């Protein structure tokens, strides 16, 4: 509505993979207090979230759901994440709102403004997992997988700790209640269940289409 909410200065990092095939590429914005304006964007940007301070945000033009890519709809990823939040599922979503991006004062396109989940501020706000100090025993452990798995926080212990837990789960039957309770005490099994539920629900039309092809 033309009302200035907040302003600041910061840096930009590359974000995404598929989106970099287009002019409207994805990027991360990082507000820098050192630049003398502000340490964070201070506003409740996402209507379904109470959080009102953001140092890092994602801006992307729907990635491979872009208008020019195979009948792209430009809203599907944001829709699924918003649906998950509305349903109260136990998964981490990139909160979504639409925005307009201008590059050097020129209109650049319709973008998505998204909450960044692999961010210490996100983990602190929603899970009370503060950064503390690097390499401390309580430092955040965070793995990210896209093609391969890499450690974003908590090196060198994060990957070995995950591998140890994963191998224990694979080596012990989860049908055993005692084993399952041990796993549940260390892993949010409800989050995994909800993740599969929403994926099944969203892809069911594609599944029916594939079955139809097989039957024909």
Regions found by a protein language model. Name each.
Residues 39-72, 112-204:
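ATP-dependent phospho-/nucleotidyl transfer catalytic cores
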Residues 7-9, 24-26, 54-56, 81, ...:
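Extracellular structured ligand-interaction cores
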Residues 104, 207-216:
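Zinc-dependent metallopeptidase catalytic helix centered on the HExxH motif
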Residues 78-82, 163:
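Solvent-exposed, polar/charged alpha-helical surfaces in well-ordered, non-transmembrane soluble domains
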Residues 72, 81-88:
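Aromatic- and charge-enriched substrate-recognition/interaction segments
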Residues 1-2, 14-16, 31-35, 61-63, ...:
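Short, flexible loop/turn elements at secondary-structure junctions
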Residues 86-100:
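Short, well-structured beta-strand/strand-turn elements
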Residues 1-71:
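Conserved NTP-binding catalytic cores of kinases and kinase-like/nucleotidyltransferase enzymes
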């Amino acid at each position: 509505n033309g009302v200035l909410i907040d302003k600041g200065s910061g840096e930009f990092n590359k974000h995404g993979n598929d989106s970099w095939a287009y002019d409207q590429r994805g990027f991360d914005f990082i507000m820098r207090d050192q630049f003398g304006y502000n340490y964070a964007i201070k506003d409740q940007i996402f209507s379904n979230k109470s959080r009102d301070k953001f140092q890092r945000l994602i801006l992307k033009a729907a990635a491979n759901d872009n208008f020019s890519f195979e009948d792209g709809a430009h809203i599907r990823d944001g829709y699924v994440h918003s649906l998950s939040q509305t349903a109260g599922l136990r998964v981490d979503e990139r909160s979504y709102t639409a925005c307009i991006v201008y590059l050097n004062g020129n209109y650049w396109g319709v973008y998505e403004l998204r909450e960044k989940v692999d961010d210490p501020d996100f983990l602190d706000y929603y899970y009370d997992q503060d950064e503390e100090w690097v390499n401390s025993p309580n430092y955040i452990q965070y793995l990210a997988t896209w093609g391969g798995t890499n450690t974003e926080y908590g090196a060198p212990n994060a990957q070995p700790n995950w591998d140890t837990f994963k191998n224990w789960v694979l080596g012990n039957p989860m049908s055993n209640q005692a084993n399952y309770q041990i796993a549940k005490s260390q892993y949010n099994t409800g989050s995994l269940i909800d993740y599969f539920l929403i994926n099944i629900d969203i892809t069911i039309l594609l599944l029916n289409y594939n079955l139809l092809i097989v039957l024909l």
